[in-house]
Amino acid sequence: MDPNCSCAAGGSCTCAGSCKCKECKCTSCKKSCCSCCPPGCTKCAQGCVCKGASDKCNCCA
């Protein structure tokens, strides 16, 4: 389980704006939920999908 979320590590979940998931993939989340979003990315506020490290996620795609 992700210590900061209600989903299994490596699994996917729907996160609230205050979520701080780190071990799972957020299928629906706000900027504060995605630790892989680079700072200053304007598109992050519109939601993103984290798939791993910052160089492997499409938060700003």
Swiss-Prot record:
The keyword Metal-binding applies. One of its GO terms (cellular component) is cytoplasm. Pfam families: Metallothio. A divalent metal cation 6 binds at C37, C41, C44, C60. GO terms for biological process: cellular response to cadmium ion; cellular response to copper ion; cellular response to zinc ion; detoxification of copper ion; intracellular zinc ion homeostasis; negative regulation of growth. A divalent metal cation 3 binds at C15, C19, C24, C29. It comes from the Eukaryota. Keywords: Acetylation, Metal-binding, Metal-thiolate cluster. One of its GO terms (molecular function) is zinc ion binding. Gene3D superfamilies: Metallothionein Isoform II. This is Metallothionein. It comes from Balaena mysticetus (Bowhead whale).
